[in-house]
Amino acid sequence: MGAGVIPFAISDCKVYFLFQTTFTGRKAGHLIDFGGGQDVGEDYRKTAIREFIEETETMYFSDNVRQATRTVERINNQIPIVEALFDATLSINPHWWCRRTPGNPLRPKRWKTFFIEFPFRDIEALNREWEADKAGRFKKRRELVWVAAAELLAIYDKAPEKLWKRVRQLEHAPEIVHAILQHKEP
């Protein structure tokens, strides 16, 4: 079992979706959600919340990204912030999540990815921190990317290979992106 989140935000009256990319390994070059496997005692939401904080190395909600480090204490301090965003989004739009195509019926994939509204943040400072890390402060070099809703829909329609397979396998994701657009863009 696992879960993820694709944050979205409004900037200049447009909806953008936040993805990450990596530079090494099997996910390199793809647009990736923030997600992973469940820890003991976690439900889908708790997993998605923790995974976002871990995979952004606690920088997204840090006041000083140069001092951000991924520690249990920092992760635990940010959980209530992200929980509140999940609560705010899902209390109004409880259907803004997708399951992953089950795949093999003998071993179906049990996965949920949530689409949650986050405050917009300029991600350049975060990306510079990852790029400048030579001492191993971060677990893996990543880069965050804001993707406009229209571009994301075009990728799903014409170039799904740009998406990490787990994001490609989300059932009804384009419909949720359309619903978010109808709800959020003027």
Residue ranges with predicted function:
Residues 1-34, 61:
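N-terminal strand-loop-strand
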Residues 8-11, 53-63, 118-123, 152-155:
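Short regulatory "switch" loops immediately downstream of catalytic or recognition motifs
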